[in-house]
């Protein structure tokens, strides 16, 4: 395959040849070979496929929320070509047997994937580390979806084992002793969008995040572990990660939503950690823009509308996001809030480096041909009805994103969209290819 007239983030306009599954050549011009498919990029922006280092594709255990087939299609439509799945499925991925079961389910994916191992009081590290783990974690320092919170002794033992195995540890950092029990005991009003979801933000405090990050990074420094802090939601948490020499991620919902949005979202805005004050959101965005934050990842954690349409204290935590991460970031770049170089660092270069995905994340000869073609001049509104996730809704309804027109994984077109008459992405002609994904560690 030959892509012609593609613009890269460094300003070059190039032709790019794909040989098999890898990028073969990048030159100002390349002559087509006989019988070679040629795609004219028409000066649109060519990016490395995004790596979402934090998803919950819910299978095995909860296929009514998401499956590897539906989640990976949603990812492909959003320009994500590799995902890393977290261990809090049913059964939890804390044994070799459970890892194998998830691996069987993951073969339905149309993109690349990594599978993380989990830690619990009864995990089986010997069998787990015998499998091709992408990383260990997220290790939960507080209870969240899946009830996999661990005590300090168990966490420290897991970190030491991960160091011995040379594996990165992803940490869900919240200190439950600093949660606000007064808020937890308050009346949260109605159900769904009528709930007083701001109480969730009051309950799971910013101080709880910062304290847990400080603890996790102290353990990391004492043991020499590679600690990665998941979904930091506050400037204090980010600063603690930087001070503790850990890497960290921020989710799109903490970048683009705040407590100000909870009157409209209700329980649809309940996640762990919760949405924060607008001034904290702005400070988090500044740290993403200036390089303090290593990656953006979604914590894609879908639930059905029926599950969200309950009271605040009963509704599950989590929002879908794998399809909208890259489009939202590209729209910020289009508006001058981020550079395109920074977007590529956040979703491609840095996650590939942190999780040792050696053939991913760059547009260079010899790298996997995981590529995304976008038109920055054609942002489109985000609507529930256009989302391919099985959940069928998004917390970003009405916002704008720059969506892919072409997504390739290992040189194969897995998603192609022909923009229509401007009525919206849901009116465009979309095609998915039936391609089998691969485990990035296999």
Where are these regions (language model features)?
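Metal-associated gating/positioning segment near the N- to mid-region
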Residues: 44-108
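C-terminal cap of metal-dependent C-N hydrolases
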Residues: 368-442
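His/Asp/Glu-enriched, well-ordered alpha-helical/loop segment
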Residues: 198-224, 295-296, 301-376
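Histidine/acidic residue-rich metal-binding segments in metalloenzymes
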Residues: 123, 127-139, 144-296
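Histidine-rich, glycine-flanked metal-binding segment
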Residues: 1-48
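A glycine-rich helix N-cap at a beta->alpha junction
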Residues: 103-120
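Histidine-centered catalytic micro-motifs
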Residues: 50-60, 169-175, 298
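Divalent metal-binding segments
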Residues: 56-64, 84-97, 117-123, 139-151, ...
């Amino acid at each position: 395959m030959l892509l012609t007239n593609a613009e890269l983030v460094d300003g070059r306009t190039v032709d790019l040849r794909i040989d098999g599954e890898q990028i073969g050549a990048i030159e100002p011009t390349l002559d087509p070979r006989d019988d070679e498919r040629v795609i004219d990029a028409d000066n649109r922006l060519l990016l490395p496929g995004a790596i979402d280092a934090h998803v919950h594709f819910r299978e095995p255990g909860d296929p009514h929320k998401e499956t590897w087939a539906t989640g990976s299609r949603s990812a492909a439509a959003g320009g994500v070509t590799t995902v890393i799945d977290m261990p809090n499925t049913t059964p939890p991925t804390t044994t070799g047997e459970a890892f194998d079961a998830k691996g069987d389910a993951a073969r339905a994916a149309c993109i690349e994937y990594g599978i993380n191992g989990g830690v619990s009081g009864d995990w089986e590290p010997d069998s787990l580390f015998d499998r091709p783990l992408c990383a260990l974690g997220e290790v939960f320092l507080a209870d969240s979806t899946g009830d996999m919170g661990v005590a300090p002794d168990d966490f420290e033992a897991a970190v030491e084992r991960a160091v011995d195995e040379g594996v990165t540890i992803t940490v869900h950092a919240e200190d439950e002793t600093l949660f606000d029990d007064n808020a937890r005991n308050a009346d949260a009003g109605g159900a769904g969008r009528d709930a007083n979801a701001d109480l969730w933000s009051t309950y799971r405090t910013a101080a709880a995040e910062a304290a847990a990050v400080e603890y996790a990074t102290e353990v990391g420094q004492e043991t020499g572990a590679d600690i990665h802090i998941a979904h930091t939601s506050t400037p204090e948490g980010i600063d603690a990660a930087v001070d503790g020499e850990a890497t960290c991620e921020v989710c799109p919902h903490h970048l683009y939503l705040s407590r100000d949005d909870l009157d409209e979202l209700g329980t649809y805005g309940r996640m762990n950690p919760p949405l924060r004050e607008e001034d904290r959101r702005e400070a988090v965005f500044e740290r993403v823009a200036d390089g303090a934050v290593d990656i953006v990842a979604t914590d894609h954690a879908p639930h059905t509308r029926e599950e969200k349409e309950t009271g605040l204290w009963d509704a599950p935590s989590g929002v879908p996001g794998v399809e909208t991460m890259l489009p939202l970031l590209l729209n910020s770049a289009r508006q001058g809030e981020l550079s395109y170089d920074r977007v590529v660092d956040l979703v491609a270069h840095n996650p590939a480096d942190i999780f040792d995905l050696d053939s991913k994340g760059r547009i260079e000869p010899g790298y996997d041909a995981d590529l995304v073609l976008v038109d920055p001049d054609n942002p489109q509104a985000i609507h529930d009805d256009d989302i391919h996730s099985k959940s069928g809704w998004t917390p970003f309804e009405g916002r704008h994103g720059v969506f892919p027109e072409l997504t390739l994984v290992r040189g194969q077109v897995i998603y192609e969209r022909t923009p229509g008459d401007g009525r919206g992405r849901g009116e465009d002609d979309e095609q998915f290819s039936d391609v089998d994904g691969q485990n990035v560690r296999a």
